[in-house]
Amino acid sequence: MKTLKKLLFIIMAVAVLAMPVFGVQAAESDIPVTEQSGVSPTPSPVPIRELVTRGNKIYYYYKGKMVKNKWKRYNGYKYYFGANGNAVRGGQRINNVIYVFDEKGRLFENKQNKIVKSGSNIYHIRTEHGRASIGYFIYKNNLYYADPKGRLYQKKSRQNGQLYFTNSGAARKDYNALLKMRVMQIVSSITNSGMSQSQKLYACWKYVVYGGFYYGGPDPNIYKSGWARSEALRMFRTGYGNC
């Protein structure tokens, strides 16, 4: 029983250490965005505001000058123009936050908790302001993983092949994925964003030691690959397990 409890704590500790850390960001209202009209107030040889497409690149000009490293809203859509003046696409890190833009450079707004596609990649939007999920997350009772640029894993494995992510981005629902989701749910329920990493680990340790887990159930086949993780899943689900 002690061996299984150690395994449960190790699994929860790994989940805590793997949790993405989101630094304190400026409020969405703090992002400098200038509302711009798509129509020049008066005819002019040089338009005051102009969105220009050259090949597959999109630029924004204000009084004839190319805008760089700025957010701009044009005809109701929000764009970010990078260091080269080109509107960014896909998942982009801006002020240490990953935002997602479509193939026309428009920010995915009002798409909170939805999966979207941009180019050949898919992303999960976690806020109404276009911020992407990073790392492991649960969506519609399925496990997903997003890389540091917010791109969902598709037809790829993680954790030495224990987790396989299908073409939809959802992990194959075997005991490995189910265990990962159960641990994430438990850790989320016993910790909070204000806790330090050591406080979270201590909370997990207390949960395993004092959480009311008992020895019981049929003997597992210890010669079968993955038996320990399968028993850990049963323990987390029912409170009983056989070490």
Question: Which residue stretches match the model-derived regions?
Answer:
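Secondary-structure boundary elements
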Residues: 178-235
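Acidic, glycine-rich loop-and-strand cores that form catalytic or ligand-binding grooves
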Residues: 238
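General helical secondary-structure elements
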Residues: 1-2, 196
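Extracellular adhesion/carbohydrate-binding repeat motifs centered on closely spaced tryptophans
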Residues: 2-181
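Mid-length scaffold segments of soluble, non-membrane domains
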Residues: 242-243
